[in-house]
Each structure stands twice: as structure tokens, then as C-alpha cells.
Amino acid sequence: MKKRRKILKFKKHMDKVLNRPSTQEPYYTNMHGINSWYDHYNAMLFDNKLPYFDEIKIKRIHGALGQVVYTTYKTKERMYVLEMLPKYPTKKMFLETLVHEMIHLYQMKIKNNTGNHNKLFYSFKNKLNFLGLELSR
């Protein structure tokens, strides 16, 4: 019951955030925003089991809103890098992109899955819809 209350409280918070007039204005990505929202989503969606990205880059990306890039070294250890755009048309788009990439990290690092847009990926769709966010490709 405690977790349910926590989720409902977070939903109320998300509703407030998404209904602010400033949410429809361009959002400039910053490390504080990424880390703060990462912690919120990690607690609500992943029970704080999702590790942090090894590195976070704010950069221009062609043909994508964000991406998780991984490199494998000789030790077979993978490094996961989150790449986000410097500017998004709206804050909602930033939030949806961040949680989208977090799901990919969850697939690859926790579930040892491919990280594709598959059944595991789309299993988060209802949770995000409940919070007022969309999960898309």
C-alpha cells in the first residue's frame, strides 16, 4: 500500500509539471535536469535498481532525440553512454526521451536483453501512460 501511495503522489507531481505553461516552451537540457528526473523515474519505475549511465553527453544527434551508446572493451566490460540533445521542443519531449533511454539501459544492463523496441520495451507503455507520458520509437 505504501508503494501505491508513492506512485499516486508522483503521478500528481507529474500532472502539475506537465500542465505548467512553461512545459510547452523549448527545454534546454542540463545535467541537473537529467540527474534529477533520472532519480525520480528510477525510484518510480525501476525500484531504484537501475544503475547510472557510465557517462552522459549533451550533444547534437542526427536522426534521433536521444540514444544509449555502448562500447565493449577488451575486458568485455560494456560502458553505457547516454546522449541527449541540447534543446527539445518541449519539456514533455525531454522527459519522454529520458525515460525511453532509461528503458533501453534497463533492458541491456539489468535484463541482458538486446535493447531493441521489443515486448520488454513496450511493457512499460501502460506505466508511462498512467504518468502522462508516451512511449514511442
Placement of each model-derived feature along the sequence:
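Walker B catalytic acidic pair
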Residues: 101
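Active-site-proximal or metal-binding-adjacent scaffold patches in catalytic folds
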Residues: 1-96, 105-137
